[in-house]
Amino acid sequence: MKTIVLLFVLVLVFALLVKMGMVEAEHGCPDNEDECHEHCKSIGKSGGYCVGPHKQTCRCN
């Protein structure tokens, strides 16, 4: 039962991160912030930028 609850919480956290516009590094970060920006625009956001300790996460706004 604990395993199921933990799995549910992890899925919920992941879904919230996606909903907040955090997308993993495959969208140009950290080397090409313009690619991140264009990706975010392509999904209906106003743009995006690379964030995190090593700027590996594309955050859409």
UniProtKB/Swiss-Prot annotation:
Main subcellular location: secreted
Cystine pairs: C29-C50, C36-C58, C40-C60
Signal peptide: 1-25
Protein name: Defensin BmKDfsin1
Function text: Antibacterial peptide active against Gram-positive bacteria, but not on Gram-negative bacteria. Also has weak blocking activity on Kv1.1/KCNA1, Kv1.2/KCNA2, Kv1.3/KCNA3, KCa3.1/KCNN4/IK, KCa2.3/KCNN3/SK3 and Kv11.1/KCNH2/ERG1 channels (tested at 1 uM). It inhibits potassium channel current by interacting with the pore region.
Biological processes per GO annotation: defense response to bacterium; innate immune response
MF terms (GO), sorted A to Z: potassium channel regulator activity; toxin activity
Organism: Olivierus martensii (Manchurian scorpion)
One annotated Gene Ontology cellular component of this protein: extracellular region
Tissue expression from the record: Highly expressed in non-venom gland (hemolymph) and moderately expressed in venom gland.
The family this protein is said to belong to: Belongs to the invertebrate defensin family. Type 2 subfamily.
UniProt keyword terms in alphabetical order: Antibiotic, Antimicrobial, Calcium-activated potassium channel impairing toxin, Defensin, Disulfide bond, Immunity, Innate immunity, Ion channel impairing toxin, Potassium channel impairing toxin, Secreted, Signal, Toxin, Voltage-gated potassium channel impairing toxin
Subcellular location: Secreted
